[in-house]
Structure formats: structure tokens, C-alpha cells
């Protein structure tokens, strides 16, 4: 099972997903950001993979390791946007197609996740309590995406997440 969330602003998005997820899971994170206070320990605790963004060879190794672990039953959270924008107002950035190589290699279902208002926690000028929402969308089974290129899979997942965010934003106006 691959959970594809969006807007990896910080480890708190991962915590929101892990808190609401029914099974233990891990995640892939930028190596530089993984060595901050408490984040390092959390990454070690859940055996997160640390990705060196400027090292393609290491990226391929991580993709292969995660694909093997997912095929064996481990669950991972991936953030295909590959970064974040300050105060993004729930806008979805373009997805990096390479993230979806893991799904193709492991034949795992892809579970799109729509995170709503998570950016407000640390990446906006909002003051006061914040309620964030985590929506797990219908899984995309391997049979549905097996003949697609990674960019086509990325586009499919992105569209489903954008539609859910738009639907929820209209419902809560």
C-alpha cells in the first residue's frame, strides 16, 4: 500500500497521516530536513528513508528499497510534490513522476491523500488553533495503472486529490 499525500511542509503532515492511518507506516523525506531536532529521532523510530535530492544514484537506491519493502507489505507515505510553498492555500504543485516508480515496481495500490489546511500550522500567518483534514481517497489498484507511464500516474493521482480538495473547500464555505 502506497499512500501518496501532498504538501510535505514538515514532519507534522506525516504525523497527521500516521495518527489517522489504521496501520503502521513509514515515509520518505529530504535527508537535509530529516536531521533537525526531534525529526531525526522520529525518522529513526519509523525507519523513514532519507532522500538526497541532489544525488540521483542514491534516489534510485531509495526507490528500489522502498519498492521492495512495499511489495513485502510495509506501508509508506510519499509526497510526490517534492517540496512546499509558504502559505500555499491548499494549492497542489506538480508531482514528480519518479515517485510513482515505486508503485510500478511493487504493484501496490496507490491511496491518494488530500491534506486540507495543513499548511496553516507552520507556513502561514494564521494565529490561533488550526483544524486540518486528512482525506483518504479510493485506492488506485495496480490493474488500473499498470499500463501507464509514471507521468500519467502522477497526473491521475494529482487530479483526484485536487478534485477532493475543491469538493471539500466548496462544502465548507
Predicted feature locations:
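A conditional alpha-helix N-cap/helix-loop micro-motif detector
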Residues: 7, 56-60, 92, 150
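Anionic-ligand binding region
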Residues: 62-66
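A cross-family acyltransferase "interaction/gating" segment
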Residues: 38-40, 74-77, 86-152
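Residue-level preference for the first positions of well-ordered beta-strands
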Residues: 1-2, 75-79
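Catalytic core of membrane glycerolipid acyltransferases/transacylases, capturing the structured
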Residues: 1-55
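Short glycine-rich anion-binding loops that position phosphate/pyrophosphate groups of nucleotides
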Residues: 8-10, 81-85
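Polar-ligand-bearing catalytic/cofactor-coordination segments
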Residues: 50-53, 139-142, 156
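Membrane-interfacial terminal anchoring regions of lipid-handling membrane enzymes
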Residues: 68, 151-173
Amino acid at each position: 500500500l502506497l499512500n501518496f499525500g501532498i504538501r510535505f511542509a514538515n514532519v507534522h503532515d506525516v504525523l497527521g497521516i500516521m495518527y489517522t492511518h489504521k496501520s503502521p507506516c513509514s515515509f520518505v523525506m529530504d535527508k537535509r530536513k530529516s536531521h533537525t531536532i526531534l525529526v531525526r529521532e522520529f525518522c529513526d523510530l519509523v525507519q523513514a528513508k532519507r532522500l538526497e535530492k541532489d544525488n540521483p544514484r542514491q534516489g534510485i537506491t531509495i526507490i528500489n528499497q522502498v519498492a521492495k519493502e512495499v511489495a513485502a507489505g510495509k506501508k509508506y507515505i510519499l509526497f510526490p510534490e517534492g517540496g512546499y510553498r509558504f502559505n500555499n492555500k491548499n494549492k497542489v504543485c506538480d508531482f514528480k513522476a519518479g515517485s510513482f516508480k515505486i508503485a510500478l515496481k511493487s504493484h501496490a495500490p496507490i491511496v491518494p491523500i488530500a491534506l486540507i489546511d495543513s499548511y496553516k500550522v507552520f507556513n502561514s500567518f494564521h494565529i490561533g488553533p488550526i483544524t486540518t483534514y486528512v482525506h483518504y481517497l479510493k485506492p488506485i489498484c495496480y490493474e488500473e495503472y499498470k499500463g501507464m507511464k509514471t507521468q500519467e500516474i502522477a497526473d491521475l493521482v494529482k487530479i483526484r486529490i485536487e478534485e477532493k480538495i475543491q469538493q471539500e473547500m466548496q462544502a465548507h464555505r
